Amino acid sequence: MTRLAPGENPPQFVIFSFDGAGWHDRWTEFREAAAQVNARFTGFLTGIYLLTDEHRDAYTGPGHSPGKASVNFGGDAATVTTLVGDLNAAWMEGHEIGTHYNGHFCADNPPGGASWSTADWNSELDQFFGFWNGWQEIDGLQGTPPLAIPASEVKGGRTPCLEGNWDQIAPAWAAHGLTYDSSIPGSGIAWPKQEYGVWEFRMQTTSSPALGSVMAMDYNFWYKFNKAKNQPERAPEIHAAVLETYRHMYEAAFIGNRAPVLVANHFNQWSGNAFNPAAKEFMLETCGKPETICATYQDVIAWMNLQDPAVLAELQARPAVY
């Protein structure tokens, strides 16, 4: 990392992130791709993926009954131990693990994050870190290899469905040592700023040549394309539209304000596996380009903290690009 001189252009950061981060095949696929182009990326772990189905009652979502969630739990013991191995391997390779919280409770399964209080968010994060530190005891798997990543390495995350009352969640971030978030919807592609006591990497919007004005996340691309209908036969069309959108975002930022580009995804196989291959193709073609660094959120924060405050302020004052 280097400190910019006044007037010097920053590198073009690209931050790949994956919500959920609980699928072995996808961990393997993206770790292998990243290794080819010296990329680092972030996985936002759903905490209940560390609980076997048998021990799902260890989780109580705020306002919900024990053992209930809007997503699956971790499966059997072999699946959970495989996930822990994936997390350990990814972290050792320089990738980052953050939080996607736990039960994925949103407006469609209330009460969701948009209505939770600070106490609710504290409970959600207390449980996330409780699973992180205690999954072996909860699941009865004390003889298996531990999760080797210190809980203190989890510094940020993304809320399910991008929901939250930010005044309510901010004290919970502070109480759990979180230093960044990437949940609040933004406008365009812009430099992160300090908001609510953390670095806020606002979710980006772009004027996609293929999709029009859209929030830059895989599910939002899908919804804009066909209202998120499962049409596997159209996977090549979706893939092309998503890849064109990523390329447009990169070029807009590279020749514009050089703000970090957020490639926000889930590990998924939606609509005939249209989305993850587009993200991987973009990673492979972009991360080796000159003046380009594919990094984690913590990497970019460390770089920003290294800069002269006046230089960083000039970057943050640059208008958003679309």
Predicted segments with their positions:
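Active-site-adjacent pocket scaffolds in enzyme catalytic domains
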Residues: 59-78, 144-257, 308-315
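Active-site beta->alpha N-cap acidic-glycine motif
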Residues: 1-96, 103-107, 138-164, 169-170, ...
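C-terminal domain-boundary segment and adjacent tail
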Residues: 2-3, 177-193, 244-322
